[in-house]
Amino acid sequence: MEIEKTNRMNTLFEFYATLLTDKQMNYIELYYADDYSLAEIAEEFNISRQAVYDNIKRTEKVLESYEEKLHLFSNYVVRNQLLEELMKKYPSDQYLISKLQEIQQIDEEEF
């Protein structure tokens, strides 16, 4: 499994997990976060390996679709980059730095 894809799916899962069904959440979490194989998931839920594979592939598409429409992850990345740039540009402005850190903290609490 590609590390980049795994990281992306884990991140999208963090942002959109609550929009998935329980079954989708379980399979994606076991496969990507807990590194279970398709066979291990199939055995755990007493279904075929192919059924697990199909569900994971559909759920990956669903997660990508949510990101295409809602942009929560991409906006989060851009927002953090902008905050970092502002902190570097104005390191002596303590008021600004504290407010930027508050914004970062809010973002971290949400996700």
Swiss-Prot record:
SUPFAM superfamilies, sorted: Sigma3 and sigma4 domains of RNA polymerase sigma factors
Pfam families attached to this UniProt entry: UPF0122
InterPro entries: RNA_pol_sigma_r3/r4-like (IPR013324), UPF0122 (IPR007394), UPF0122_fam_protein (IPR054831), WH-like_DNA-bd_sf (IPR036388)
Family: Belongs to the UPF0122 family.
Biological role stated in the UniProt entry: Might take part in the signal recognition particle (SRP) pathway. This is inferred from the conservation of its genetic proximity to ftsY/ffh. May be a regulatory protein.
Record's protein name: UPF0122 protein llmg_1069
